[in-house]
């Protein structure tokens, strides 16, 4: 998103293997000890959670979050945050990180992932982007 809106930024590595995300300094900006998180030094704010970051940057920049279509954009962004992302994440967990550990998990999340991709293909066969003809934060978050 930062690339899309043309904002300058600096990446700060958080070493998850060493547990950097659990240090008190990091928990001040990300209370659940998760990435991503951004710090807007201009406005002296930290923002955590992918969807919240996308909304914040879209509102700040005035890009990819059309006021006339926000309900539709929000629907698709929330679908990504609450369904698409978590389900594809589970598929990845069972098929790539822990193959052979749970036949039930592998089959379940393979079927769900396949259905998600079919549903997204169906939506995108009818419109250029998820929420219509404009590229939005819903598309950025989902793809």
Where are these regions (language model features)?
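GST superfamily/GST-like fold recognition
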Residues: 87-92, 130-143
């Amino acid at each position: 998103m930062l690339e899309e809106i043309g904002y300058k930024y600096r990446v700060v590595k958080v070493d998850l293997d060493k547990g950097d995300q659990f240090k008190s300094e990091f928990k001040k900006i990300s209370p659940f000890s998760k990435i991503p998180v951004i710090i807007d030094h201009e406005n002296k704010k930290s923002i955590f959670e992918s969807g919240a970051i996308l909304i914040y940057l879209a509102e700040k920049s005035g890009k990819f979050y059309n006021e006339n279509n926000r309900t539709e954009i929000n629907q698709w962004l929330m679908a990504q945050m609450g369904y698409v992302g978590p389900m594809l994440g589970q598929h990845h967990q069972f098929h790539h990180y822990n193959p052979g550990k749970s036949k039930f998990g592998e089959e379940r999340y393979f079927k769900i992932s396949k259905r998600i991709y079919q549903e997204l293909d169906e939506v995108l066969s009818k419109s250029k982007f998820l929420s219509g003809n404009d590229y939005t934060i819903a598309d950025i978050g989902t793809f």
